[in-house]
């Protein structure tokens, strides 16, 4: 646990955790907390995920897609949600023009989100009632999340955490080709190796070299392991 980005990136620790401060708010992808209470809970969740991983999947449940920037989480989510039994819930963020519902920083901070995170300087949040509305239909909730968001989701709902894997060269190429600032591209690339470590505490992993094949693979996994 540290608030200095270079210390977190260079540590040999299996699960480095960033203590959020104003000077590191734009750092992307790392396990992060805002206070010691959140850190203690995060450690408990990592231990539980490592020791008591359950391969049985409740139907319906939340499918949390995690992985480095450029791994294709959003594309995989969109592909899954083209199928009848999968659905994206309503989510909120502080970036205008994004797929999420836009809120100003002031509006966002006034909302009651049960799960929220800051990614590359942008805040994202989810409301419990929006998740419940999708589950009530009998649909799987599909969400690209960072690891902290996925763990928070698992605290409240039946959740399967899926690591979306891709070759590092393709991750870097995808990040470079995106319409991000140089600073944001740099931060996303720097976080790749740290984010790859999170694969060990996920329930499943899918190789996303081809989104169609990854969609079929993950759909089959969910179907074959549902209770």
Question: In which residue ranges do the predicted regions lie?
Answer:
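Small-molecule kinase domains that catalyze NTP-dependent phosphoryl transfer to phosphate-bearing small molecules
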Residues: 5, 150, 180-221
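Acidic, Mg2+-coordinating phosphoryl-transfer loop and its flanking beta/alpha structural elements
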Residues: 3-37
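Walker A/P-loop
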Residues: 74
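P-loop (Walker A) phosphate-binding loop of NTP-binding proteins
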Residues: 68
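ATP-dependent small-molecule kinase phosphotransfer cores
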Residues: 87, 91-141, 147-148
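ATP-binding Walker
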Residues: 71
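Hydrophobic anchor at the beta1->P-loop junction of P-loop NTPases
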Residues: 65
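Conserved phosphate-donor/acceptor-positioning beta-strand/loop module used by diverse small-molecule
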Residues: 142-145, 155-176
């Amino acid at each position: 646990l540290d608030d200095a980005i270079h210390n977190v990136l260079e540590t040999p620790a299996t699960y480095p955790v960033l203590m959020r401060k104003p000077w590191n708010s734009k750092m992307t992808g790392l396990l992060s907390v805002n206070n010691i209470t959140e850190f203690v809970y995060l450690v408990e969740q990592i231990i539980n995920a490592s020791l008591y991983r359950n391969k049985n999947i409740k139907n319906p449940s939340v499918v949390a897609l995690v992985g480095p920037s450029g791994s294709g989480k959003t594309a995989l989510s969109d592909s899954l949600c083209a199928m009848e039994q999968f659905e994206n819930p309503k989510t909120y963020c502080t970036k205008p023009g994004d797929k999420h519902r836009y809120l100003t920083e002031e509006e966002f901070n006034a909302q009651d989100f049960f799960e929220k995170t800051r990614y590359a300087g942008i805040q994202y949040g989810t409301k419990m009632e929006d998740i419940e509305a999708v589950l009530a239909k009998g649909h799987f909730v599909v969400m690209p999340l960072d690891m902290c968001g996925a763990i928070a989701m698992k605290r409240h709902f039946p959740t399967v955490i899926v690591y979306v894997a891709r070759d590092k060269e393709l991750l870097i190429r995808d990040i470079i080709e995106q319409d991000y600032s140089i600073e944001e591209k740099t931060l996303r690339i720097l976080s790749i190796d740290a984010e790859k470590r999170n694969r060990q505490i996920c329930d499943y992993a899918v190789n996303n070299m081809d989104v169609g094949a990854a969609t079929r693979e993950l759909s089959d996994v969910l179907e074959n392991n549902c209770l």
